[in-house]
Amino acid sequence: MNGMTRREHQIFDIDKILEILEKSKVVHIGMVDGDEPYVVPMNYGYTYENEKLTIWLHGATTGRKLDIIRKNPKVFFEMECDLVPFDCDVACKYGLSYSSLMGKGIATIIENSEEKQKALSILMKTQVDMDFEFNEKLASVVGIIKIEVSEFTAKHRPLPSK
């Protein structure tokens, strides 16, 4: 990805990046539908294995999002956490402290029941930090999207020192 403008805010420590993935609960998925941008907020799960980030999404088994991915599987994602607004005596110095993660990857619609069950377990572990098992019947009524992330960057904007 292109270099970050405020490089002093960039996070390189993978443990801090994984913390953003744990704390955030919604990911915004950007797609292109023909010549029109389309962004959807979604709950997610993730795995980070062998230095490879994978994001798992669930939703309906039909709809615009899946239609777009079938035509163009390239996606962009963004998530944030630790949002803390701050004020100042000058309007232009008001702001927001946060941590964020964004990147791009290739989305695949998962049809295999075992992989869907695994994805649902990962998603629930990420969202509520509990282990759940899913069966074929439950997996059959849910659409699963797997994003194999090719690039990502993370950022932390701290609270200003007073």
Regions found by a protein language model. Name each.
Residues 24-61:
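Short beta-strand segments
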Residues 60, 64-87, 94:
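Helix-adjacent hinge/juxtasegments
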